[in-house]
A protein has these predicted regions:
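Electropositive phosphate-/nucleotide-binding environments in soluble metabolic enzymes
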Residues: 9, 13, 25, 111-115
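C-terminal cap/substrate-recognition subdomain and adjoining C-terminal extension
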Residues: 28-29, 33-36, 40-179
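Alpha-helical membrane-targeting segments
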Residues: 1-22
Length: 179
């Protein structure tokens, strides 16, 4: 699936479904433990120090930090132990009777799904966002709908398609972070 996606022989949606199919038949507790270990051992060490500093800065300024991502949420919860992230909104996996089916529950949280999921989350909490004072960060064209909502739109090590799509938008900037 990875090679097929890299060669553009399949869609991002299908590649994601294939990459997550290994979860089928695994218990919820097992998957969540594997996810936390993956996050701690693989993901957190790879975070850009500038990104971590930026999140901490925004939090210190009083911002409520939300992670809105196409990634599956089962392995991201451990980020809350390291970063000032209040909530994670991402791709949900289908669980039936405590067992992962390997299927995505609903839609992949990318593109227009990001602002839709945020709106659902806010409505469920009776909460609001001041988009005129908000910051959003992204790296791909799938982040453009979320970036477009916020006054401060930051493309981090962006793919060219995102820069083309957002070029000229008020509040749009590009940054390059490294390890």
């Amino acid at each position: 699936w990875a090679a097929a996606y890299g060669l553009r022989l399949t869609t991002a949606e299908r590649a994601k479904r294939e990459s997550l199919s290994f979860l089928a038949g695994r218990g919820q507790a097992e998957v969540e433990a594997l996810g936390r270990a993956f996050c701690r051992e693989e993901l957190i060490p790879r975070l850009y120090p500038q990104g971590v500093e930026e999140l901490r800065k925004r939090h210190a300024e009083g911002a409520e930090v939300l992670l809105i991502t196409a990634s599956p949420t089962f392995y991201l919860e451990a980020l809350k132990d390291e970063l000032p992230i209040r909530r994670i909104i991402g791709t949900r996996m289908h669980v039936e009777n405590g067992v992962y089916t390997g299927l995505i529950a609903g839609e992949n949280c990318r593109g227009v799904q990001k602002p839709l999921r945020l709106a659902e989350d806010l409505a469920a909490r009776g909460d609001m966002v001041d988009y005129a004072a908000s910051w959003a960060y992204g790296d791909s064209a799938g982040d453009a709908p979320m970036l477009a909502l916020c006054a401060h739109k930051v493309a981090v090590n962006p793919k060219k398609k995102l820069v083309r799509r957002m070029k000229g938008a008020d509040g749009f900037s590009v940054v390059y972070w490294s390890k």
